[in-house]
Structures are given as C-alpha cells and as structure tokens.
Amino acid sequence: LRVFVCEYVTGGGLLREPLPPGLAREGDLMLAALVKDLAVLPGIEIVLSRDARLPLGTHPNWFCIDTENRQAESPLPLRERARVRGSQTPRASRTANTTSDTPSPCPSPTRGEGTRFEGLASTRRGIGFSLLHPTDDAWEAWRDLIRAADAVWPIAPETGGALARLTDLILAENRILLGCRPDAVRLAASKLATVRHLQARGVPVVPTVPLGEVAALATPGPFVVKPDDGAGAAETRLFRDRDGLDRWAARRGADGWIVQPFIDGSADSLSLLCQDGAAWLLSCNAQRVEIRRDAFVYLGGIAGGREARRALYEPIADAVAAAMPGLWGYAGVDLIDRPGGPAVLEVNPRLTTSYVALGRALGANPAGLILRLVADKLAVICHDLAIKPEAVDLEPLDA
C-alpha cells in the first residue's frame, strides 16, 4: 500500500513565503512521528512532499524524487506500480531495506465514486520525498503524488481552507482518504460554527461569539480573541477589559475574529479515534499554554497527562463524535476543565501535536489502529490500554 503523507507546512504549502520556524518544527514533529509509525507496518510504502529549504532527515530508508529532475545518487526504480486507474510513478527513487510483507486490498470508507481500489503489492520498503522548490506549484505536485498513491494522509491546518481543499483533491482523484470527511473538516474550520453545532446537540462548550457581538457575553472581561479559522494558539490574545478589546477591534476590524470569556481552568485535549459517529478516547492530554505579553503561547503538553479525568471526558468524546459523524480516524478536541465541568473549545479534524508522543503513551501504534479502520469497525479495534504520560516539548525557538 503506497501512502502519500502530505504535511502542509513542511511539504510545500508555504513555498513562496518565509517558513515560520515554529510551525515548521511542529509540522516536522508530527510528520516524523507518523512516518515512524507507518514505517514499521508490513507492506506500507511511504511517500512525502518536502519543501526543499528543509533538511530531509536521517531515517535509513530514504529514496528521493526531485521535481526538478535531479536524480538522487544511485536511483532505483520502484519494483511495483500502483494499480489504481490514473496513477503515476515518481520519476526517480532511492531505497534501502526490503520486505516480503504485502497488504490485503481493502475498500475505503471515504473515497470518490467510480474507481475500484486494487491496492499496491510492493515488496520494496522506503520513505520517499518529492522535493518542492519555490518555482513549483505545490498543488499540482500534490495532485501528481496523490495519483501515484493508493491512500493519502493529509496533515494541514484548517486555516484558509487548506485542509478542506486537500481533502477534496484526494477524493476527486478516487484515493483512500486517511482523514476526516469533508463535512467535518468544513465545520471544524470555523470555531464559531463548531461551538454552535455542538451546543445545539447538548455538548458543553465555551461561550463563543463573533467579535462584533462581544456584548452578548455579558461579562466585563477578561476576554480571549482568536481567528475563527485559526490553528493552535496562533494570533490568540488576552484582553483584560472591554476598553482594550474595543480599541484593538477598532484598529484590526471585527471580521473573521471570535471572542470568548477567559476561563480559569486546565487546558486539556483529547485524542480520539473516530468512525461513523462513534469514538474511542485514546488519551486525555494536558496542554502547556502560557500567556506572554498578552499572547497565548503553546508549549506542548503531556499525552496521557490527564488520564485521571477519563471518566469525565469519555462522555464528551462520545458526544462530539456523535454530533460530527464525519470525523474519521484521528481527531483532537481542545477543552477547558473548569470548576463547573469541562467545556469544549474546538475540534481538530486532523493530527494534533499530541500525536508526537501518543504511541509512547499508549504502548501501541496509533497509525496501525487508524489504518485498521479502513476495513474494520471501531468496536472491533477497541481494547484496553495501559497509558503512560509522555511529554511533547515545544518551547518557542525565540524564547
């Protein structure tokens, strides 16, 4: 099975922009964790796209495909081609180890119409990069890589519709989507729409309104302001009172921003495995978030660090999945554990930073569990886990 892992930030999504070091590091951490998990599974061949400004990495099983036709040293062709209609084979490759394991063909739970999946019986193991340069069109390159794959695992922010566009492209090319369905992706792209959707279905949420309707919160402050389609803590700010918030809003404008009351509580997250409206709560995570000069800074967290709250968080995980049946595979839920009970902040229909330590925390391979969802029901996969807290450190590079 050839899997194209498309990590947006490190994989070419910012080719014509300066690469933010923090975002690139966070993307690389998630990418490396996922690739490590996939690489040990039998019959899996991995291809990545890579911004050529970044180092390739040190994994022993690299092969390299260069979009400018610069062949890697001693290139070797792939032994097998994908037998999916319209597929293409990368131009040059370099591999190391081999294996005789091959996957069994299986149907996709979420794919475009009209193409029968036949699988890829490859005996060559490798992890490949398609190097993208500033002169390249990342979306065209990704389309080619999607066509050359059997399945695609998107890791992209909701910001600007990037994840939704990538999801649509995968399905348009009739490939297996190893991620959430378009309806869930589009809903989660708006924090405001997500909160309203969950609240209408009885899920406890943090009160959220458009910035222009801050009076509806009926509180003098403090307030938290963030982009409606933002990812992580990017551009999330604290305002101590209404006057400061109003002055800032007058300068920046209210469009595209949401406001929430600041709630003193524990910033936690949930790592879920989802399918057809059901959820398996893999881990309850602690998040490290600090406020520096009235800006929220995400410093990482501890996967499995809030397992003591599992009994309280499992009903929330179930309720979120039931309210958003388009969640499939891995999904993250951010919440605040406040004195009156936990409240959901947002839903992430993609890998989150907690995935970096998730495998170590679970003592299991989360990528393997997710791939099993292609053929098996969630209830068949679920089993007891002995969870050990594992940290993810994201101290800012400029700290």
Annotate each language-model stretch with its function.
Residues L1-L23:
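Nucleotide-activated donor-dependent transferases that construct or modify glycoconjugates
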Residues L29, A33, D37-L38, E45-A72, ...:
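Conserved N-proximal alpha/beta basic substrate-recognition cap immediately N-terminal to
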Residues E80-A82, G112-G114, R124-R125:
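Glycine-biased, low-complexity coil/linker segments
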Residues R116-T123, R338, L369-A399:
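Peripheral (often C-terminal) accessory segments that flank ATP-dependent C-N-forming ligase machineries
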Residues Q260-P325, D337, N348-V374, D393-E395:
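ATP-dependent carboxylate/phosphate-activation module, predominantly the ATP-grasp catalytic core
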Residues L327-P339:
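A short glycine-rich, hydrophobically flanked beta-strand micro-motif that places a catalytic Asp/Glu
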